[in-house]
Design a protein with these regions (language model features):
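Acidic/His-rich structured neighborhood in mature extracellular/periplasmic domains
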Residues: 1-9, 21
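Structured C-terminal helix/loop/strand segments within mature extracytoplasmic catalytic/sensor domains
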Residues: 11-147
């Protein structure tokens, strides 16, 4: 039973965004420019607790992400927000590395399989792209040029 159903015919723009807008939002949060620095830090802390970040982190080397056994700080952490609806799978966020942070946004649509699972083609594709970007950032020690 839905107590507050969404009537999509009334909300045609619900959930409408672009990768550029989503990336700009994360960049402003990372810089503390979206709201106050304190509120931005709280937002980052919440986004770091996101459990549904498979598209961004699935192919990352586990030793970068999990330092629970040693008590050492994580070498890489991700503050992200994912979303999906029907044939769309999206994820975006801030990836912190020893060489600095970068923003990544992956948006996929028009997949025939609308079921949510980690080996969904959109998740596999996104994880590979995310890993390629991480590898480049680490190989260049954070010195990437867009020129």
């Amino acid at each position: 039973v839905l107590h507050n159903p969404l009537h999509f015919d009334r909300y045609r723009q619900l959930g409408t965004t672009t990768p550029r807008d989503y990336a700009a939002l994360f960049a402003r949060i990372a810089k503390g420019e979206l709201v106050s620095r304190e509120a931005s830090a709280e937002m980052l802390a919440i986004l770091r607790q996101q459990h549904y970040n498979t598209m961004l982190t699935h192919d990352f080397p586990q030793y970068y992400l999990d330092c629970e056994e040693t008590g050492a700080p994580e070498l890489i952490w991700v503050a992200s927000k994912s979303g999906s609806m029907n044939a769309c799978r999206n994820d975006g966020g801030i990836v912190h590395t020893p060489y600095g942070e970068y923003v990544i946004v992956l948006m996929n649509k028009d997949f025939h399989d609308i079921i949510e699972y980690n080996e969904h083609p959109a998740m596999v594709y996104g994880a590979r792209v995310s890993r390629m970007i991480l590898d480049q950032v680490l190989a260049c020690e954070g010195r990437l040029s867009l020129s």
